[in-house]
Design a protein with these regions (language model features):
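Short aromatic/basic micro-patch
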Residues: 110, 139, 176-177
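Conserved alpha/beta core of the MobA/IspD/sugar-nucleotide pyrophosphorylase nucleotidyltransferase superfamily
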Residues: 2-4, 146, 150-203
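Conserved nucleotide-sugar donor-binding
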Residues: 135-146, 180
Length: 203
């Protein structure tokens, strides 16, 4: 089966050592970030969404949107590219030809469906940019996907893929949830972030 629509991956297999708690379960408006990411990808038109997590977190993810699949990375310590490879291999079991995949790390939540739509309207691999700063999610085309699949699991994605920078209207794009201080920043801005998530998104 081949999908003309993009496919989505949410990466949340990291061990969250610096934050001290699971990033995927951080809530905005009472909804975990992993759920927000899945919703945004589905609203953007992704034909399938897969969450890549670790064994410990898998049983604590709770209810995800209908149709979202979950796969476990047995070696999350190998980093983001390893998790991306786990997700891609899972997608390959259902879609033998991967044309375009949207990859969203759960700890970079400052985007919504409109950002994905803008990215997939371009050809090739792309990443969003707001006020000169690049962010996530990113879109990988078939050539980039092959590079990722053939790379060591600890390789840096920026060394594997040449992303086209695409301007987007995403004031929260640089938001990162990696440390307690960054989580505190999210809490201070939670109401505004929730308004951004839900404005015009049909949620």
């Amino acid at each position: 089966m081949t999908s003309k629509a993009p496919l989505g991956l949410v990466l949340c297999a990291g061990l969250s050592k610096r934050l001290g708690s699971a990033k995927a379960l951080v809530e905005v408006g009472g909804v975990p970030l992993v759920v927000w990411a899945c919703r945004h990808l589905l609203d953007a038109g992704c034909a399938a969404v897969v969450v890549v997590t670790n064994e410990q977190l898998r049983s604590n993810l709770g209810a995800l949107p209908n149709g979202v699949q979950v796969v476990t990375n047995p070696e999350p310590e190998n980093g983001r590219t390893g998790s991306l490879q786990v997700g891609l291999n899972h997608l390959l079991s259902q879609f033998p030809v991967l044309k375009r995949v949207v990859m969203a790390p759960v700890d970079r939540p400052g985007w919504r469906a409109g950002v994905v739509r803008t990215l997939v309207a371009k050809t090739g691999s792309s990443c969003p940019v707001f006020e000169g700063r690049r962010g996530h999610p990113v879109v990988l085309d078939n050539e980039a996907l092959q590079s990722v699949l053939n790379a060591p699991s600890d390789a840096s994605l920026r060394d594997l893929v040449d992303f086209q920078a695409v301007e987007v209207d995403a004031p929260w794009l640089s938001l990162n949830i990696d440390t307690p201080e960054q989580l505190s920043e999210l809490r201070r801005n939670e109401e505004a972030l929730l308004a951004y998530f839900t404005q015009g998104e049909g949620i």
